[in-house]
Amino acid sequence: MVKICCIGAGYVGGPTMAVIALKCPAIEVVVVDISKPRIDAWNSEQLPIYEPGLDEVVKECRGRNLFFSTDVEKHVAEADIIFVSVNTPTKTRGLGAGKAADLTYWESAARMIADVSKSDKIVVEKSTVPVKTAEAIEKILTHNSKGINYQILSNPEFLAEGTAIDDLFKPDRVLIGGRETAEGRKAVQALKSVYAHWVPEDRIITTNLWSAELSKLAANAFLAQRISSVNAISALCEATGANVTEVAYAVGKDSRIGPKFLNASVGFGGSCFQKDILNLVYICECNGLPEVANYWKQVIKINDYQKSRFVNRVVSSMFNTVSGKKIAVLGFAFKKDTGDTRETPAIDVCHGLLGDKAQISIYDPQVTEDQIQRDLAMGKFDWDHPMHLQPTSPTAFKQVSVVWDAYEATKNAHGLCILTEWDEFKTLDYQKIYDNMQKPAFVFDGRNVVDPEKLREIGFIVYSIGKPLDAWLKDMPAVA
């Protein structure tokens, strides 16, 4: 029986291994992690991450051919194929700080694999890593090999949170990069045969190692670039009276462009986009390509501009001050159908409002109060380090309350900011919300969730990203 072990029980490792176990009942799959609370959660009824469909997959396989364990060395030693899905955070100090990927956890995993292995292994990069990481890992394993043969493969994930299980069931493509040697091709074929249990052969792409590593960074950079492009146009729409939804629809009808990732918003978030672009920028700089690096930097600059522009709009609309005013924030996750708050635009928006001394009341259906307070208290890149290295008792913001529903959040509020596109926010009783808010009552829709005209009929003053401005807002000071 083939045995697969995955090091890292996070957003990628857990769901990916669960689906492999479901689709390959003859393969034993073990997910290992040094975090006992995380493994305990995977073995409980309350999984550590929220993802539609994940519960059902885990419950069907767990205890049959899917296992979660803290006995890392035992299962690594026994495995034929080892997936490494550990954090690759952005460095916070030293060479490349603020841009380069920190491969500390990857290197530790590689050294541990070399220490405990007693048979040949296929080691698979699942984490997003810089180009040429496989070469570095290969050197560590080879120099500590004790006669054992290691083949390194790159198999980047292309999952979107909120649809991860569907993405795993029906992927656009599965990318496998390996060495162009007889042993390398054999290793690629071994991993290909795992995915072939449910993925059509024409969707399994094989490349060399470096192409696979760069493809992941490039894919995320291209997606983020589309979001920043439409967000840049949204600012121009507001200035000219155009409607970004209409513009995006017209542009997306061009078959060369297509409609996906053309929704204007308060900005992109998530664990990958900004981190991977910064990594790409650093790689370009290291390879003497400053013009290319500067091109990709602009994607992040527009994203930061969009968030600060949103905060400025809130403050300037409300008589140029939100000091002491209650502002309701609906949605804290970086997008709907996930509880993930990593790099969520809500953090920067809340910080901007808190900087102007607002009182903030937050509601998100999937994010806990502890997580929200932790996110608001943490430094820029702290979120991407293991839990035991994060602040254990973050200082709670006295101006922030986290509540159990949207109606409680908006009660007596002066303004309402929609920062995540949860479906439930489309069907709220906005008349009830309006009746319980201070007047004038403002709605700042950072996700274009609501119908601005219907809300204006109720009495709200409405700002929607990239839409023609409310008459009230036209008379307010210009937003920088």
From Swiss-Prot:
Classification via SMART domains: UDPG_MGDP_dh_C
Catalytic activity: UDP-alpha-D-glucose + 2 NAD(+) + H2O = UDP-alpha-D-glucuronate + 2 NADH + 3 H(+)
Residues reported in the UniProt entry to bind NAD(+): 8-13, 33, 38, 86-90, 127-128, 161, 272-275, 342
Active-site annotation: C272 (nucleophile)
Classification via InterPro entries: 6-PGluconate_DH-like_C_sf (IPR008927), NAD(P)-bd_dom_sf (IPR036291), UDP-Glc/GDP-Man (IPR017476), UDP-Glc/GDP-Man_DH_C (IPR014027), UDP-Glc/GDP-Man_DH_C_sf (IPR036220), UDP-Glc/GDP-Man_DH_dimer (IPR014026), UDP-Glc/GDP-Man_DH_N (IPR001732), UDPglc_DH_euk (IPR028356)
Top EC class of this enzyme: oxidoreductase
GO cellular component: nucleus
EC number: 1.1.1.22
Pathway as given in its UniProt record: Nucleotide-sugar biosynthesis; UDP-alpha-D-glucuronate biosynthesis; UDP-alpha-D-glucuronate from UDP-alpha-D-glucose: step 1/1
The keyword Manganese is annotated on this UniProt entry: no
Family: Belongs to the UDP-glucose/GDP-mannose dehydrogenase family.
UniProt protein name: UDP-glucose 6-dehydrogenase 3
Organism in which the protein naturally occurs: Oryza sativa subsp. japonica
